[in-house]
Amino acid sequence: MTAARIFETPWGRMGVAATARGLARVVLPGKRNARALARLATIEGRQAPRAARVHARQAERQIREFLRGRRRAFSVRLDLAALPRFQKKVLLAARRILYGRTVTYGQLAARAGKPRAARAVGQVMARNPVPLAVPCHRVVAAGGGLGGFGGEAALKRRLLALEFHNNTISPQRRRERRGKSE
């Protein structure tokens, strides 16, 4: 069984779905994702295992913190069990891309052990079921362009700007920002 949560953020309406194994789906804000949010709404509030509800709440909290610039990495467990091996390998390699940094599709392919599979990596990123938790927005085209993004290019640009901005703030200022009440 799956637990789902739909929630408002300053960036727009988002949703998550989790199983007892971990986070299985993140739905980003945007027109393209209206159907996915509608599907999540059909399961939100249903009985689900406690572990699934815990993972969904944890994912929501971490997404909110991330979008406020107060989280750099996601610790929520992922449920990628239904995905093919190559896709899992690429997603786990992408999860290790540091906050505020970018890599090219080719570099990510090499990190996943398939240096000649840049296009296949691009397809995996396009189908990433858990964006933000697996930061596919940090993967860019070799020529310096943004590359594709399932959550729309403007959102990718905004996510990268958030990270680059927060990376340029001094550690003291960052501590002060974290200490402020919401």
Where are these regions (language model features)?
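Basic nucleic-acid-binding alpha-helical/helix-turn surface characteristic of O6-alkylguanine DNA
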Residues: 1-116, 162-169, 182
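Short glycine/serine-rich loop segments
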Residues: 116-158
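Acidic, glycine-rich catalytic/binding loops that coordinate metals and/or anionic ligands
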Residues: 151-168, 173
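Short, low-complexity, charge-dense intrinsically disordered segments
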Residues: 172-181
